[in-house]
């Protein structure tokens, strides 16, 4: 409606200009009529007519047209005068008079001399009319040019209106599309916000899970540290007890040595006194006895010096132990003070003995003849005491060697535990660093991302990486648990094993029962086969057939019967193995093979068919040519072996992870077989301290000879 109104308003100036042209033509026609033809119009009392003002972009400007009516007194003629104002030298507007009477040209208004002309038919009037025609023709030409300009402007306006309408339609369409797009974008934003909230909740859940796992790891680490600390405290207590016992024994032995020294000095005084007062023969005898006792005194002095050196050695060892444990400082200081006090007492006793010797020299010589027999008895008892002391010293040295071996084992285990702790600390530190880096990366990515699609993709990638890390952490925990389990299997039997081993034993109890039944059947068949082999070769085949027939008839139905039958046949058809090649000696353990090149020790265990033989608490000791020793003890809980079994001890390597091992043990001590190997002694010690010894040759391989039979076996 607005566009139609605009078009009507814009078309009105053209119509007014056409009406004006028609009026001007009619006016020229009326001027050629006689004078008396008059144009009459209805009178209107000063009613101004206003024209529609039109605006154009280039040439048309605002114009105001005023129409005035003037009436003459004689003929009542209404005259209209138009005045137009033009700015900037262009036609700005056109007049549209109210068509009520035929207008006349108001020339007399501008030329006052024309108003005095008498009649219209005068020649001045005709000239005036001619001028008016010229003016009208000029006005017509101007109006035509103005009309052309108006038409061109109107066409341009119509074009612009059409363009405006097209643009308006396009804008409305684009606005609708933008509104639809904005609605879609708002929906997408809502969906993405929901997805983002879900992802953030998932991320928080994952972070909580990681925190819980970290707390579990920390708890496990604290438990392991407590266990290690308890084991270390136990080892320190055992070491302190052993050292205190040794020190007490050393003090007692020193006291006995001091008593013997005092007795020797007393005897020396007797001899010297009798030598002075007696005859020459007795003097010679006493001199010989004196020299002999002097040699013994020197020996005892050497023993004292060696004991002093041992005391110094113990002091040095105590000082070294003082660096490793703070709890031993007070005890070591007390022991050092006791040793110094004893040394002072020894010196005081020596001084007092020397004084007493000077005082009692005369008295002792008088009693010499009476005590010669007693002296001989004392010498004999002294020799016996000497032998007893030597045996005690040997036992003490053996105990010290065992303690050193145990200390080496404990040090190896402590080193392994420290390595495991460092590995766990490193893994926990790396995980913490990775978590912090992932958090930083996630923050940067959340800040740098501009589109929600990219955020979702990155969050999914982060979740996948966290899942992978969780999986890797779980595998790492399983691996560390298996390593701890393998380490606990190698711990000294005096230290109690973890409860996990008992639970694992309960889990595999059913499997062990089936395995024991199968081994029992096989061992019976082997025993029967060995007995038959000693009698006759033909009897062996008959025994095999009978044993296989009995096992097939008495075995269970299904797959278990077929497998046991096959196992029995296989065991009966292998007479050349290491278990069948030697005679069966129940309740014995012997060396079968010692190979220093491939680093393993193979033992042959002969267990009773009823109760079996367990090698728990048995020990292996390797003595190098330079005197250094290393020991390995079999752990508790080893099932008894029935029949002839081969047990292998691998040295210098840890227990393999994820692979079951049967009758195999692992001694993690490294550099056990370093050159030179020749002369290395390998000892097998039973719980009752019975020892079997093997010496390695130059090639480092010892193999039990086939004819030896029982030469290296330890009979229980």
Swiss-Prot record:
Region (Disordered): 1-107, 519-584
Signal peptide: none
Biased composition (Basic residues): 1-10, 35-45
Compartment(s) of residence: Nucleus lamina; Nucleus envelope; Nucleus inner membrane
Motif CAAX motif: chain residues: 713-716
Ranges of Low complexity composition bias in the record: 62-107, 546-564
Protein name, per record: Lamin-like protein
Species for this entry: Dictyostelium discoideum (Social amoeba)
Gene assigned in the entry: lmnB
